[in-house]
UniProtKB/Swiss-Prot annotation:
PROSITE patterns: HEXAPEP_TRANSFERASES. Its EC number is 2.3.1.129. Pathway: Glycolipid biosynthesis; lipid IV(A) biosynthesis; lipid IV(A) from (3R)-3-hydroxytetradecanoyl-[acyl-carrier-protein] and UDP-N-acetyl-alpha-D-glucosamine: step 1/6. It comes from Escherichia coli O157:H7. Keywords: Acyltransferase, Cytoplasm, Lipid A biosynthesis, Lipid biosynthesis, Lipid metabolism, Repeat, Transferase. Belongs to the transferase hexapeptide repeat family. LpxA subfamily. The gene is lpxA. GO terms for cellular component: cytoplasm; membrane. It comes from the Bacteria. It is found in: Cytoplasm. Homotrimer. This is Acyl-[acyl-carrier-protein]--UDP-N-acetylglucosamine O-acyltransferase.
């Protein structure tokens, strides 16, 4: 169904069964598949392909040659009706690719809201990207990667499958991330190693001086105390009782499966 207030360019193809919301704009030479939902006010500039069981929220801007919901590159994929879900107010720039999930990975690739995906960024099958993240030009997420809120992945950086990138992390350009990156940390290099706390990012987001100091103290326990992670976990949990921002570390430890970058 195409809402009567939506615009569809005469050269675009919207297959029967697709849902196009109010005031959406489907530009020239776009292709929208039969199981696609496009939300209110979302704009497909031109030459955009949206395929598969894909749901896109409202007020997104999707630029030319982006491909969303296409068959993933997992060799086990056998055509199952897996999905892509994208939230609201994202800017998805030229030639970005977002692939549908796999049955083995839960069947869903999910992108939240208010993200900026720069030119040629790739989000593979079963990834989860939170809110207000930035993937710079040519940043690549392998399958099953999780990127938490406010994280930034630098240009041409690559993240290994199943890794977790914590909230407020900054991954430097051209880095190769092969293990989990705890929240608030700057990661740089190939293989990526920790380079301190993303202090400038935290200041910009309104973190208090006291909270930043507590986060730095937690970082020092993890990386500079000479103790094992199991040894410092109780100390970090105690610190989190006074500074709730530190609880992001304890929650992250419970999710981590690949070990932390070192």
């Amino acid at each position: 169904m195409i809402d009567k207030s939506a615009f569809v360019h005469p050269t675009a193809i919207v297959e029967e069964g697709a849902s196009i919301g109010a005031n959406a704009h489907i530009g020239p030479f776009c292709i929208v598949g039969p199981h696609v939902e496009i939300g209110e006010g979302t704009v497909l500039k031109s030459h955009v392909v949206v395929n598969g069981h894909t749901k896109i929220g409202r007020d997104n801007e999707i630029y030319q040659f982006a491909s969303i919901g296409e068959v993933n590159q997992d060799l086990k994929y056998a055509g199952e009706p897996t999905r892509v879900e994208i939230g609201d107010r994202n800017r998805i720039r030229e030639s970005v690719t977002i692939h549908r999930g796999t049955v083995q990975g839960g069947g869903l690739t999910k992108v939240g809201s208010d993200n900026l995906l720069m030119i040629n960024a790739h989000i593979a099958h079963d990834c989860t990207v939170g809110n207000r993240c930035i993937l710079a030009n040519n940043a690549t997420l392998a399958g099953h990667v999780s990127v938490d809120d406010f994280a930034i992945i630098g240009g041409m950086a690559a993240v290994h499958q199943f890794c977790i990138i914590g909230a407020h992390v900054m991954v430097g350009g051209c880095s190769g991330v092969a293990q989990d990156v705890p929240p608030y940390v700057i990661a740089q290099g190939n293989h990526a190693t920790p380079f301190g706390v993303n202090i400038e990012g935290l200041k910009r987001r309104g973190f208090s001086r006291e909270a930043i100091t507590a986060i730095r103290n937690a970082y020092k326990l993890i990386y500079r105390s000479g103790k094992t992670l199991d040894e410092v976990k109780p100390e970090i949990a105690e610190l989190a009782e006074t500074y709730p921002e530190v609880k992001a570390f304890t929650d992250f430890f419970a999710r981590s499966t690949r070990g932390l970058i070192r």
